[in-house]
Every structure is written in C-alpha cells, then in structure tokens.
Amino acid sequence: MLMITSFANPRVAQAFVDYMATQGVILTIQQHNQSDVWLADESLAERVRSELARFLENPADPRYLAASWQAGHTGSGLHYRRYPFFAALRERAGPVTWVMMIACVVVFIAMQILGDQEVMLWLAWPFDPTLKFEFWRYFTHALMHFSLMHILFNLLWWWYLGGAVEKRLGSGKLIVITLISALLSGYVQQKFSGPWFGGLSGVVYALMGYVWLRGERDPQSGIYLQRGLIIFALIWIVAGWFDLFGMSMANGAHIAGLAVGLAMAFVDSLNARKRK
C-alpha cells in the first residue's frame, strides 16, 4: 500500500477517488486528521500522481464532478459537513465574477422598485443621437433583466463559465471577454430590435463559445465545456430564432456573443500554441 496524498476536505478526496475509479484505478480513503488516499497497486503510482496533478489544477472541472455518478456508488462511509452554499459560490467565483453578479442583482432590484422603463432610461443602449457619448450605455444593457427566471438563468451560467475563466485565465481575460461581447452583442441586437433590450445572455453565449473552443483546442488552458452543453446552446439559439417557445429572446445578441467567444478562443488558442 502506498499513500498518494492527503486532503483536508473529505469530499474532494472522494471526488478524486471516484474519478480514478472511472479510469480503472482503485484507491481507498483512510480518515485520520485528514483524508489519506492510498493505492494498493504501487505499479500505478506514476499514473495516479500524474492524474492527481491535473486534478489539483482544477478540482471543479465537470469531468470530476460527474465521476461520482459514473462510479455508481454513494455509500462512501464518509461523515463530513456539507459545503455551505456561499462557500461553494466563493470557491469558483473570483472578484470580477462577484462584482458582475452583485451589479446585476442591484439593477434587478432597482427595476422592481422604480420600474423597468425608469432604469432603462439610464442604462439602455443609446436610444437617441444625443446619448451616443454616454459610453456606459454600450455595456450596461447587460446588467438589466426583466424577470426572476431571466436573471437566475444568466447568473448561473455567468458564475459557472465566468468563474472558470477568471480562476484559470485571470480577471483580465474575463473583463476583456465581457466588454467585447457586451459591446458587439448589443450592437447587433439593437440592429434587430432597437435599443430596448437587456440581459447578460450575449456575454454568457460568448463565454460558452470561448470555454468550449478553448478547451477543445488548448486543453492545457484548464477550462472545459462538455460538447452536449454547446449543442444545447445552439439548439436554444435555433429555438429562439424560430420562436418555438413563444418567448421574447435577444437572438441577435445570442448569435453575436457566441461568434465573439469562438473568435476570441480561436485567436487565444493559436497564440498558446505559438508559445509552446
């Protein structure tokens, strides 16, 4: 028996053990002051340590989160406190991710108190030539949401995708993606529907495109999105385009945002390959 590593949190230890089980490697956990992970077949030590290094780089990667389901067991025998909800949020979200979430919530509350129209007069895309130099308007349309479902859906994806980008690639990269996608998706959407629109979905689609393509072309970046989710995003765009659900969707912003994210991921992955 060879001890591979120790984890302070038993759930993290179990996630790694479950993932290795899906790879055909059996590990066991012994509880002492920490959760010690042991390997019976020492000939596999080098492989396990290599997988451990990748796991420690991004333990929140979906492939690890899904491993417990694939392993097919829930009775681990572990006894530990669950992560508090806000602790789980903090673990994945950096400062930029948090600032955007708080800003969207504050604006949403203001819209409930003051009314949509009053807030849009201050934050909407320039709706009059005299407003074209109020530069914040080219970005603040992304902060406005018109229903609870609208804001919850967008902020969930923003936290999941934006948090991953910020944690792995830095706050600067998330800021650049956000500003460019908000600007260009807003420009396209106002050509489709005029200036009266809002929501973070253009930025969310940019992040979907970016995380998926960057993960496909540059796995070492540490970000990853399952192909099934990007297919879902494309189906949602098609459904919105043909009004299959009878909901008002910012189709122009969705398409433009996705295109921006894919383009930025393509350029960044090319640059990453050149540096190798």
From Swiss-Prot:
It comes from Escherichia fergusonii (strain ATCC 35469 / DSM 13698 / CCUG 18766 / IAM 14443 / JCM 21226 / LMG 7866 / NBRC 102419 / NCTC 12128 / CDC 0568-73). The lineage of its organism: Bacteria, Pseudomonadati, Pseudomonadota, Gammaproteobacteria, Enterobacterales. Rhomboid-type serine protease that catalyzes intramembrane proteolysis. The gene is glpG. NCBIfam families: PRK10907.1 (NF008155), rhombo_GlpG (TIGR04239). The active site is at residues 201, 254. It catalyses: Cleaves type-1 transmembrane domains using a catalytic dyad composed of serine and histidine that are contributed by different transmembrane domains. Keywords: Cell inner membrane, Cell membrane, Hydrolase, Membrane, Protease, Serine protease, Transmembrane, Transmembrane helix. It is found in: Cell inner membrane. This is Rhomboid protease GlpG. PANTHER family: RHOMBOID PROTEASE GLPG, RHOMBOID-RELATED PROTEIN. Pfam families: Rhomboid (PF01694), Rhomboid_N (PF12122). Its EC number is 3.4.21.105. Belongs to the peptidase S54 family.
